[in-house]
Amino acid sequence: MNTNIIQKVQTYLGAQALYKDSTTTNNLFAGRNLPSFVKDFLLKKYAQGEEIDRAGLTGFLNKVMPTGDLRSQLIMGQDITLLTRFSVNIDLVHNVRRFGIPDLGIKEREGQIPEYVASKHPELVDGEIWGIIKMCLMPDDDGKKSHVEMVDFKPFKPYTSVDVSFVQNVRKNFTTSEWLDLIISSMEYEPDSFETMHQKLEFITRLLIFVEPRLNVVELAPKGTGKSYVFNNISKYGWLVSGGKVTRAKLFYDRAKDQSGILKNHDFCAFDEIQTIVFQEPAELQGALKSYLEQGKATIGDKEFTSECGLMLMGNIPLTEDRKPVNKRYFDALPDNFRESALLDRFHCFIEGWYLPRINKSMIYKGWTMNIEYFSEIMHTLRVQNVYAELFDKLVDYDRQAGVREFTAVKRIATAYMKLLFPHWISANDVNLEEFDMYCLQPAIHRRGIIQQQCHYIDPEYKAEMPAIWVKER
């Protein structure tokens, strides 16, 4: 990244600027499975310019992420304080709020959250959470067995709120190319390692689902292009499903447990290596997905499930020697359960992952950039900013015969690009129409057009061509 951008980062981002050098800091986190948004928070906490207070950071990690056999320490009666990722499950049958820590092998049936802790923290609901917990071993009510009890909890939320206007003002000082490089560097990649602007735009398109509610995306790419990393490391508001079994109950609502599923409390849910995931009761799941992808709600028994969570399907696709898909029918790479036009037509956006480079060590960024934990909070906050969708309506005209799904898809994708690349556009007068067309509208039409074409291959009843959608003249 060039020195001009770095100077702007230091000048305009202020406290949200962070110096990254994983070659010297990764060993500080060795043996601790931490996502980037946690690492950036800790590095910022102990940063002194380009240097890190290594002793202070190590001491903090030893305190809240102790090593050793923690289960044995619990059995010996020790209290343990831990910064960790844990899951919460409300057991209505036994009237108990349970938690588990997958990284430590503590199962949900072994952990309990008492009412005095739960009542102070409404976020302790079904799902996965990052936070600092204090726990100890306590006897069950009957005295015959014991359980791990959470006696205190502090959510991992360094930013209780973020001011979007700050980022909007910062963005005014960067060109579009510079802002794009800043986003990529905050994701820990060296912008100069991407060969073209097209590659960079393809890469950051993965972030659209972070900023736009109920955006449904498909990405097919070769292995090694960093799909898992983006969705597992940048934001605590997403959920990554990697392998295993998926049911309607797990995604939407479990009637037996009266418990909401993954989609309820997350900004997005990404299926990684979708070819390896087993979808049980596929007919039930497919029916719920069709309804949810279309309307943001699904009926499970007598329960209506609603959410703003977006869905991401990620899979591998075979390529030729010149890195083009072997088969023009891209969706043949998906599992049978997802290879139905009526379901796929409800997805908005397609990412052509074969244009992305294979990730290697030379692509890891070193230098000043934006703190990714801060940027993830900005993206989360942008989801509820309606000004960009209103701008789209003012800027765009379209063929009145356009289908609702096609137009909705283009609007959501273009709106997401505005939030990500042009957050400072808050009135029509702010908008550069040429850039809007180039970076927002045309990519949106193209990405929805791929969905359209692929559905046509499956079922010729679906039109292959996109309707006319264009920028209004001023």
Would you name each region that the model predicts?
Residues 312, 333-348:
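C-terminal, active-site-flanking charged/polar segments
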Residues 1-187:
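Extended, charged/polar low-complexity intrinsically disordered regions
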Residues 190-323, 327-329, 345, 467-470:
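Conserved ASCE/P-loop NTPase catalytic core
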Residues 205-206, 299, 333-338, 361-364, ...:
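Short secondary-structure capping micro-motifs at structural edges
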Residues 158-162, 266-271, 318-326, 350-359, ...:
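Short acidic (Asp/Glu) and glycine-rich catalytic loops that position anionic groups and cofactors
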Residues 63, 343-344, 348-474:
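Conserved NTP phosphate-binding and transfer environment spanning the P-loop NTPase/kinase superfamily
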Residues 318-337, 359-369:
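Conserved P-loop NTPase catalytic core
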Residues 284-288, 338, 342, 370:
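A general alpha-helical scaffold signature found inside nucleotide-binding enzyme cores
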